[in-house]
Amino acid sequence: MGVRSQSIKENTMCRSFIFLAEGFEEIEAITVVDVLRRAGMDAKTVSITSDLNVTGAHGVTVAADMTMSEADFSDAEWLIVPGGMPGASNLASDEAVCRVLKEHKGKIAAICASPGVVLAPLGLLEGRDATCYPGFEEMCKKGGAQMRDVPVMATRDLITANGPSAAMRFGLAIVANSLG
């Protein structure tokens, strides 16, 4: 019992932030939060607006843990970008989100449309292996990505996934990367 408790305590050092914008894909965000928290990781949802309540692409409203103005990303291991439309577009058009992603020295994970809509225009896929939701490959390629036809593409500091059906594997890849 004591060993398990210690293990969970140590895992909370793996700080992760999941951005939530109006129109986010609920499965991609909530599944990842659930998987990370079950693994003992410190996973926080961040609303990109001043309102903690964020409504997903399918009408599910979620109360985020904090807003962008309340978040301190300085010790983040992971920044996680769910997809969904118009969620991915809303993230891409938010200057604060783009700045945080570009300045982040840690790891980034993006799923569905977000590799193409959010990461590629920021230059974060340049020369990297990636996957995305079908139809967004050209955006990724424009950003310099080497496209892979796999559900989840995991490297040392970048994980991408192709959509809702890969959400569980996406979350597990983040956990495996952080905790082994």
Segments predicted by a language model, with ranges:
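Short N-terminal binding/cap micro-motifs at the start of the first secondary-structure element
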Residues: 24-29, 53
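Hydrophobic residues within alpha-helices
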Residues: 31-32, 100
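Short glycine/proline-centered loop/turn elements that form peptide/ligand docking sites
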Residues: 30, 47-50
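Active-site-adjacent pocket-lining segments in enzyme domains
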Residues: 14-20, 24, 37-47, 64-180
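A cross-family phosphate/adenosyl-ligand binding-site feature
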Residues: 55-57, 61-65
